[in-house]
């Protein structure tokens, strides 16, 4: 779900907008503080890794520390070794996680004396809300009555001033497994948005999922009047959004199957961007001769990629082939601004320049970082195997593929290319051509089993 920012709105001729995500951030921050304060004293915070990124955009570690958090752990299957009596879990309603929490509770209880004062005090908060399945698993594990349970409604995550995300990895559960939980989560998030920013009168949608969501939103509006929300009347009546457009993912399955060719898109392809964060460091090897395999890195450093990085904001949406010239332009601009110091004559001019020094230094540091990343992208993009893959994607997309193009996929399987690369190409072909002929399906299945028996067994189990 997106909303136009001032810069983007002007780009598309929509005029400026005063929309700000500050209210969303503040609501999520206040609720997080309530979650932490619900458990008195010192505590350990155990976070589902998929929630860690969104949480870091809401509150800094200093805020957690102020409200009693002594240690932070990522939720995993291993026993949780900590001296903290109080444990606060913040997790998605994942059935596997419920078993891990139960195992950790039992392990902690076994390591301490049997007196009630020494038993672990566990509180589980679900993001964005609990499910009956999770309750049932906790009951089956025998700990449902021994722990406290609540919800933390971190359902809308502001990634940028013009980009909001639910951060839900729910394509398979919704489209393959038929789990309707996603629709309810999206509906609650949109209602929350309207409570904060005013009612959106017009709903437009395309796709079956969009239709179901629209009908649910209409029912929720009847059951709950946004005018009754805890806002002042000007907020409720003066919403700057007159429409919401809902697009079902199945409307366009081709785009996510193709390699992204913008600068930001290729960073995501090579390094994987998670909630605006990416881990990048100096490569320990050049790009693989088979460019279908990204370069390997060591001593990774976590970076934030958003519009607060002025260099990144200028190049993120550009095609990678023109990024080099833009980086040169940015370098020249920074140099010209730094050279202005030689022309300064008055005290006022000196003070104005001094106020810019910090920003110029940050931009120069950012420029060096993006020059390094761009070099990696060029090595990857210039490899003949990468070019061959992109050419195959282009052919598949236009429905002009032949048996020789399918042989290219067989070649990738034989070279033990990453299974994601193989499956993306196969899925792209199937989406455009309405599936695979039986003889091709049997051939691909046989090759995958022969080359990667362990992988096929893993996929079969899932």
Can you describe what each PLM-predicted range is?
Residues 1-462:
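Extended, well-folded catalytic/binding cores that form a central cleft or groove in large enzyme
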